């Protein structure tokens, strides 16, 4: 069975509340920089959003696996009902986030 695995240890735990109007990914990236976090996990995320832009996965005919489709936009109010992800960095030390979120719109539709 092919897989990649990495081991880590739980160190600091940081609780974060972003101010209203803050872009979630930009806010998380800035929080990581301020806290000196190069690698980590996002264990949970919830909240209310004015709107959201996101991408769904799509098959790519020229590449194994999946990629991302067109950017979709929802206007608020939007509930962030669940979020989790990883924090890593590239060779230049820039913070990279990979976050999955479940969203609910005003009509009860899940996104």
Locate the predicted segments by residue.
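N-terminal intrinsically disordered, cationic/polar leader segments
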Residues: 1-111
């Amino acid at each position: 069975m092919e897989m990649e695995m990495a081991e880590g240890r739980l160190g600091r735990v940081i609780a974060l509340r972003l101010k209203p109007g803050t872009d979630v990914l930009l806010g998380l990236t800035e929080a990581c920089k301020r806290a000196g976090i190069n690698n980590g996990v996002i264990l949970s995320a919830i909240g209310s959003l004015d709107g959201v832009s996101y991408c769904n996965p799509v098959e790519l005919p020229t590449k194994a696996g999946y990629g991302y489709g067109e950017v979709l936009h929802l206007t608020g109010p939007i509930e962030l009902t669940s979020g989790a992800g990883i924090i890593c960095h590239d060779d230049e030390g820039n913070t990279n986030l990979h976050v999955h979120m479940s969203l609910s719109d005003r009509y009860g539709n899940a996104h």
